[in-house]
From Swiss-Prot:
The gene is tlp. NCBIfam families: SASP_tlp. Residues 1-76 are annotated as: Disordered. Coiled coil: none annotated. Signal peptide: none annotated. Keywords: Sporulation. It holds the Pfam family Tlp. This is Small, acid-soluble spore protein Tlp. It comes from Shouchella clausii (strain KSM-K16). Induction: Expressed only in the forespore compartment of sporulating cells.
Length: 76
């Protein structure tokens, strides 16, 4: 028998992912600042581009979080 799909913790899980991603962005910025003289322009650009992708992911996760919260409200 298939295990029931329990999504009750999805909002909490998504919030944790968003928080971790924001922390990674901050750490990447701090690293780039602390090592700016040691990093090549290409490395600095790679860090910046990765943070831009992280920001896009966060935007998508925030939308997913809204959907999950609304779904839970409608199903309770």
């Amino acid at each position: 028998m298939a295990k029931r799909d329990d999504r009750s913790n999805n909002p909490e899980r998504i919030e944790n992912i968003i928080g971790n991603t924001l922390q990674n962005m901050d750490e990447a910025r701090d690293y780039a600042k602390a090592h700016s003289e040691e990093l090549s322009e290409e490395e600095k650009q790679e860090i910046e581009q990765k943070n831009e992708r992280r920001e896009q992911s966060i935007d998508g996760l925030r939308e997913e979080l809204k959907d999950e919260v609304n779904d839970q409200k409608n199903n309770s």
